[in-house]
């Protein structure tokens, strides 16, 4: 079998009107991942609906409802090859009510491309753009590039490009902790393909890489095989003749037959008999592998979705309480001590109570603005002490970042996102 190229997960982020889906569609077409005939058909469909220019976006906006609204809702995954990688695109939704998807999407990303409209230099940075960049930073994405889109609308003006580059650098990236000097800003016209996959003939002043070349310059993630084993359970099946088969994705560490393991917070202990992926038995599985495995000594009723598997020598941490850094994204009123929304962390969904709001922070710099504030509102960042209403596994981001991040949901929306910075473990 030929060695496949390494996979790189790249999130495309930015405001809903910046042309993200069109940029992605163009990458897929010029990268040979979609049939040009499909674009011809979608162009016709777009024109009939009075949405000319949406044909590339339709590739990612696979859901019918999305096509009609012209809005990306779910996290869509598509692949295309570059010289170096097999790139999986995570096209993150742009609208506020879909931030939950954004969080689950971004946490799978190794790098991100922020798509901005060159016209933003006139209108200012959209709040949504800020939120997206802040979120990927909070979720641990450290590699970023910026696509300055719709350059054809300003006749590929170098002055307009430089104005936007300075604004994004000074007013957004520096404040959030990215160094603009180390970030590629690529002038593109995605609808026409300029500098997306192929170099543009229309802006001779730009000598830098295309979006595809920038993606090739990203570093592949190092698999966290040296961290303790953590595998959040997604589902548990009973297979005749085999027994109990939990399934999930290895987040950290390595799992292999013969391992003595424990599921927390269930407390069930067993031994791994077999590990399978795509119906093939594996000698071991590592981070990123979606596997099913058979455990001796553990029944279907003993464990459930949201439990986390680890080795008995280094079990997952069950928190009695934890301290977290959070950012409030949206809330109709204010958050105070005693507030108990649902926390989504790995595969678990557990209500946690705000025991104490300890500090309010500047969301851009992290400096303390106020000690022991009475409340938090949308846009605030804070350090808070939280108490789970029932046992849950969460790890400190300093130790196992993959299990330290969470989204907070309430009233059908994502009200906040954050990470655990200190965890008080339940005594075994």
Swiss-Prot record:
Protein localization: Cytoplasm
Keyword Hydrolase recorded: yes
Highest rank taxon of the organism: Archaea
Alphabetical list of InterPro entries matching this protein: EFTu-like_2, EFTU-type, G_TR_CS, GTP-eEF1A_C, P-loop_NTPase, Small_GTP-bd, T_Tr_GTP-bd_dom, TRAFAC_GTPase_members
Catalytic activity: GTP + H2O = GDP + phosphate + H(+)
GO molecular function: GTP binding; GTPase activity; translation elongation factor activity
UniProt xrefs under Pfam families: GTP-eEF1A_C (PF22594), GTP_EFTU (PF00009), GTP_EFTU_D2 (PF03144), GTP_EFTU_D4 (PF14578)
A GO term from the CC aspect: cytoplasm
Any coiled-coil regions, as ranges: none
Region (G5): 189-191
Residue numbers spanned by region G4: 149-152
Chain ranges of the tr-type G domain: 5-225
Region entry G3, spans: 91-94
Region (G2): 70-74
Function of the protein: GTP hydrolase that promotes the GTP-dependent binding of aminoacyl-tRNA to the A-site of ribosomes during protein biosynthesis.
Matches recorded under HAMAP family: EF_Tu_A
Sequence similarity: Belongs to the TRAFAC class translation factor GTPase superfamily. Classic translation factor GTPase family. EF-Tu/EF-1A subfamily.
Name of this protein: Elongation factor 1-alpha
Record organism: Methanococcus vannielii
Taxon lineage: Archaea, Methanobacteriati, Methanobacteriota, Methanomada group, Methanococci
């Amino acid at each position: 079998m030929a060695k496949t190229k390494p996979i790189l997960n790249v999130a495309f982020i930015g405001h809903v009107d910046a042309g993200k889906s069109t940029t992605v569609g163009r990458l897929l077409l010029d990268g040979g991942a979609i049939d040009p005939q499909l674009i011809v058909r979608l162009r016709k469909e777009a024109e009939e609906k009075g949405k000319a220019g949406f044909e590339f976006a339709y590739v990612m906006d696979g859901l019918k409802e999305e096509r009609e609204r012209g809005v990306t809702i779910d996290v869509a995954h598509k692949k295309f090859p570059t010289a170096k990688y097999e790139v999986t695109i995570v096209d993150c939704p742009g609208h506020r009510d879909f931030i939950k998807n954004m969080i689950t999407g971004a946490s799978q990303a190794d790098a991100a491309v922020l798509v901005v409209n060159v016209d933003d230099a006139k209108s200012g940075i959209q709040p949504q753009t800020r939120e997206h960049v802040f979120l990927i930073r909070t979720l641990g994405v450290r590699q970023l590039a910026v696509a300055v889109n719709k350059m054809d609308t300003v006749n590929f003006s170098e002055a307009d490009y430089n104005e936007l580059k300075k604004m994004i650098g000074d007013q957004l990236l520096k404040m959030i902790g990215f160094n603009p000097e180390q970030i590629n800003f690529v002038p593109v016209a995605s609808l026409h393909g300029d500098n997306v996959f192929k170099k543009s003939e229309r802006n001779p002043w730009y000598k830098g890489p295309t979006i595809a070349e920038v993606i090739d310059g990203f570093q592949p993630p190092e698999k966290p095989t040296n961290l303790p084993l953590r595998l959040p359970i997604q589902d548990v099946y009973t297979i005749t003749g085999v027994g109990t088969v939990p399934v999930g994705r290895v987040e950290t560490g390595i799992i292999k037959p013969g391992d003595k393991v424990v599921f927390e917070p269930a407390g069930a202990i067993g031994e791994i008999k077999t590990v399978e992926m795509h119906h093939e038995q594996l000698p071991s599985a590592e981070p990123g592998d979606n596997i099913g495995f058979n455990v001796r000594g553990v029944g279907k009723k003993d464990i459930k979705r949201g439990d986390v598997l680890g080795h008995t020598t280094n079990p997952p941490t069950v928190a009695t309480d934890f301290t977290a850094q959070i950012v409030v994204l949206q809330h109709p009123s204010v958050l105070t001590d005693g507030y108990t929304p649902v926390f989504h962390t790995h595969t678990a969904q557990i209500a946690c109570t705000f025991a104490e709001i300890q500090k309010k922070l500047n969301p851009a710099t992290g400096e303390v603005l106020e000690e022991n504030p009475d409340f938090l509102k949308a846009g605030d960042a804070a350090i808070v002490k939280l108490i789970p209403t029932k046992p849950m596994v969460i790890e400190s981001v300093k130790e196992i970042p993959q299990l330290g991040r969470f989204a907070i949901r309430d009233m059908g929306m994502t009200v906040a996102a954050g990470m655990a910075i200190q965890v008080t473990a339940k005594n075994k």
